[in-house]
Amino acid sequence: MQVPFSVEARAVSLQEARSLYFGRGELPEALLDQNVLRSWERCRQAGLDPARLGGGEPDVRGVAEARERNRTLISHAQPVLEHLFEQIRNSHSMVILADARGMVLQSYGDADFLSRAEQVALRPGASWHEFERGTNAIGTALAERGAVNVFGSEHFFEGNAFLTCSASPIQDAQGRLMGVLDISSDYRAFQRHSLGLVKMSSRIIEKRLFESEFAHQGLLSFHARPDHVGSLCEALLAISPDGDLLGADQAALELLGLRREDLPRRHYSMLFDVPLGTLIDRARRDPSSLIAISGRNGERFYARLRGNFAPMSAAASALVDARGERLAGRPRQEAPVPAPADRLT
């Protein structure tokens, strides 16, 4: 869909979309992003009235309990929220952290915008689940399990049409929804880069959560581009000393063509050609260096292993890789020959 560039043109096209949808019962597919249209459909099926005020007052007691339930999320997200707000300060905006139920846990914002946001209960303790507040970035990001923009009159409730919001979900190391990061502002202050900012910031939080959960395991950082290892673009695998896969972030699943449910049936040696012992030895000798490895389907990656692995002998390395072959249901083969020196960078 080609979205008009100007705020004014977009506002006009959204009034046309609302007229078609709410006035004539037609689907304005050419005028709305599909995630917004799906949200409108969910809200209508739930019996929400676009003319009413959404939800109730913030739950002071409930937010205290929610913060306790989500203390791990908050501890890793707090510095990211503060840094993100510094980037958008003085732009008539606010930064919001909500939990997996859509309850606002924390917020930072410019005073002039916060006072207006409070008029629609966009503050800690309020639920912004779709069935409470209609289409909105927090609730819709949770429902869609993906990053979304909700601009002006794309909000289901007319009273929220002064907002423009960008939100990205936050997942834990097992792929479960933990919460949502959101930037909200007056729609007239719309910034195209807001969605990119929340996606990047949510990725930072997810990376912190993953590394914290597997802090005492081996962490394999890898990517097809060597300059992406150590950046937000890197993929992460958590590996036991025996080569079992303990966890994978979304980037790792995508690069390796795996589903999360595949992990318990996979072993390090089923994915890469370089023996785990070689990686461990390299990590002990030169922790900052990269090693070139190939996937079992021929993909070329660059990797760095972190963790407190004990030194592994060649015999132990062969046993680990042989165990992986047995898990794969294949006959035992000779242990892979370590990569030649010119592949180690």
Kindly give the residue locations of the regions a language model identified:
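Intrinsically disordered, low-complexity terminal regulatory regions
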Residues: 1-132, 136-152, 162, 171-242
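Short, solvent-exposed coil/turn linker segments
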Residues: 60, 126-130, 186, 259, ...
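Short linear motifs in intrinsically disordered
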Residues: 85-86, 226-229, 270, 277-284
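Short, surface-exposed beta-strand-loop junctions and turns on beta-sheet-rich folds
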Residues: 111-113, 252-255, 309-310
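PAS-family sensory/regulatory modules and their coupling/dimerization elements
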Residues: 153-154, 162-167, 272-333
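Sensory coupling linkers of modular signal transduction proteins
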Residues: 181-214, 229, 303-345
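Signal-transducing coiled-coil/dimerization helices and immediately adjacent hinge/linker segments
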Residues: 208-274, 328-345
